[in-house]
Design a protein with these regions (language model features):
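Negatively charged, low-complexity tracts enriched in Asp/Glu with abundant Ser/Thr
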Residues: 1-40
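Generic structural hydrophobic/aromatic packing signal, biased to beta-strands
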Residues: 15, 19-22, 65, 91, ...
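Amphipathic, interaction-prone secondary-structure segments
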Residues: 33-57, 62
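Intrinsically disordered, low-complexity regulatory segments enriched in Ser/Thr/Pro
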Residues: 58-82
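Well-ordered alpha/beta subsegment
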Residues: 85-100
């Protein structure tokens, strides 16, 4: 499900996989795998380079930035965590704007 306006993710359960397009400031949420959410956004016009995975815990209003799709040695991200603080902050801000 692509999210372009504020929504409450509580109906998805206690844990929701999301992918954030940091350029378009939209989210895809609720997919079984982060890559499925990424495909949804790419089909909608997003570029993979702008997509970053995270996990949202709506009840606790918590975010973790762990996803296999975040491993990008070519972009200096060698971990499942988002290592670039600017990108991480952007992902966090977009999630907070659209979810919390």
């Amino acid at each position: 499900m692509i999210i372009k306006e504020k929504i409450f993710l509580g109906s998805f359960g206690s844990f929701v996989k999301v992918v954030v397009d940091i350029e378009r400031e939209i989210i895809s949420a609720g997919c079984e795998l982060h890559v499925d959410c990424a495909e949804e956004l790419i089909t909608d016009g997003s570029l993979y380079v702008n997509l970053w995975g995270a996990n949202v815990y709506p009840k606790d209003k918590k975010i973790d930035f762990i996803s296999l799709m975040n491993i990008r040695p070519a972009d200096n991200n060698r971990s499942m965590d988002i290592e670039n603080p600017v990108i991480k902050k952007r992902v966090e801000d977009i999630i907070k704007k659209l979810v919390f």
